[in-house]
Each structure stands twice: as C-alpha cells, then as structure tokens.
Amino acid sequence: LKKPEFIISTAMNFFMIAAWFSTYSYFADYLNRAKNMDNTTVSYMLFIFGIVGVVANFVAGKMMNKSVTKTTLFFLTGTIIVPLLLYYTTDMFFTTIIIVGLWGFMYSPSFLNASTYMISSAPEAMEFANSLATSFGNLGVSIGTTLGGIIIIKYGVEFTPWLTFIFGILAISMIGLRAILENKKHSN
C-alpha cells in the first residue's frame, strides 16, 4: 500500500473504470437521444456491443500474456478514440454501428485490464491488490455514473463522451507516471 507504483496503479484503475462508465451507464439513452435510434435499434446495438465484447475479452487475455502495460494502454486508447468518434459522427447510422462495435471491443475487457494492471504493481500481495482493484473499480463505476448523470442534467447526454475522454486522459497519464517511476528505480 505504500508503494507509489501501487497507488498510481490504483488511480489508473479508478480513472479507467470511471471513464468507461460515465457514458456506458447511459448507453441506451445516449443512442436514443444523441444518435436518434429507436428502442429496437438500441437493442441490436447492445447485442453487437456484447458479442464484440466477448471476442475482446479473449483477445485481451492473449495480449496480457505478452505485456500487461501495453495491453492496458491499448484498450485505454478507446477512452480517447470512441468519445471523439461518437461526438463527431452525429447520427450516421452505419458509422454508429461500427463505432458501437469498436466501443464494445475497447470497453469490455476494462475490468480485466484495470485489475491486472493494478495487481502487477504488487506481485507480493496479489490477493490484497485484487480486492482493492475490485473496490476501486466499483468506486469508478459509482463516480463515473454519478458525474455522467450530472453532465446529462446540466448539458445533455450527448456530452457524456467528453467525461469519458477526460477520465481516459487521466488514466493514461497514470500509466505514464508509473512507467517513469519504474524507469527511475531500474536506473538507480
């Protein structure tokens, strides 16, 4: 708990999960209002999202075997790319299908990536790190969803992707900060 790398990894976990849930928690509402989709179409979008997500978890598991940090960073780029695509594509139907597929792919392994990344910073206390990963992930869900709701009330659901973007930048910066600390330790 005293290792700076562990604390930074915990913050990354929180920011990553908060990023994804600030928009995903309002998935149906977002597609209804911002993309002008009816409820039946939204159901199909959820199906696409889920199917792609199953594939993404398999891919993420394979990638984790090669590099936990690179895998986490790869999937975190979705917190930057997906919000930009969602915001700037208005209600283009077929483009939205592709974006929802990408969203499902980048989002679905988020708990796997966040907890594995966090645990990798404390290999001597894996059980403890795992329990904190779950707790901070749940905190990220709560805070991301709450702030997403506040954005909806103040500005509208179409602006929730910007919250995802901001939390994503914070999560990526935590990975960079941890890398700097680890490089300093190895050079000393």
Tell where the protein language model's regions lie, with residue ranges.
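Helix-to-loop junctions at the C-terminal end of transmembrane segments
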Residues: 55-68, 152-153
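Extracytoplasmic gate region of multi-pass secondary transporters
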Residues: 5-47, 51
